[in-house]
């Protein structure tokens, strides 16, 4: 290849540019489906909380999932399933998500949102609005939540 041949270099640049655009188009074309899937999972989590449905979390949370809660506690998947099984010590009275945004990075998606809830947990009433971040990874054909973090909103 002759470095002094500008036509050759321009041609290679144009080919690389179009190849890059094709990949970008393919990824962004898939994003609306992923955004919808993750948004649905977030809204399904609210329904699971309101109905006390641990099966949802058994299915959606990765085995090594963790959550850093707004009260400074870390929870594991086993902790959440145990809490949900004890309906005497966990009841969601109300919950509503707002400002839900989903960003997709290949097989990873990050959801951020505000969560306003009123719950009874271990005999303590908590009524707060938090800002939260959930991280999902595509594992096989399913999206699994691998991490979550919530902090009280100001």
Residue ranges and their predicted role:
Residues 1-5:
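N-terminal secretory signal peptides that target proteins for export/translocation
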Residues 25-154:
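A beta-strand edge to alpha-helix "cap/lid" segment located at domain peripheries
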Residues 9-20:
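Bacterial N-terminal signal peptides
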């Amino acid at each position: 290849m002759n470095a002094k041949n500008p036509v050759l270099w321009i041609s290679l640049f144009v080919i690389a540019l179009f190849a890059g655009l094709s990949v970008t188009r393919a990824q962004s074309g898939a994003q609306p489906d992923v955004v919808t899937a993750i948004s649905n999972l977030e809204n399904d989590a609210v329904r699971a909380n309101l109905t006390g449905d641990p099966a949802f979390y058994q299915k959606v949370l990765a085995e090594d999932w963790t959550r850093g809660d707004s009260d400074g506690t870390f929870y594991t998947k086993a902790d959440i399933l145990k809490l949900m099984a004890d309906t005497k010590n966990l009841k969601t009275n109300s919950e509503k998500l707002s400002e839900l945004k989903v960003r997709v990075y290949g097989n990873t998606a990050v959801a951020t949102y505000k969560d306003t809830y009123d719950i009874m947990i271990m005999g303590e009433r908590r009524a707060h609005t938090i800002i939260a971040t959930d991280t999902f990874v595509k594992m096989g054909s399913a999206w699994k939540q691998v991490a979550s973090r919530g902090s009280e909103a100001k």
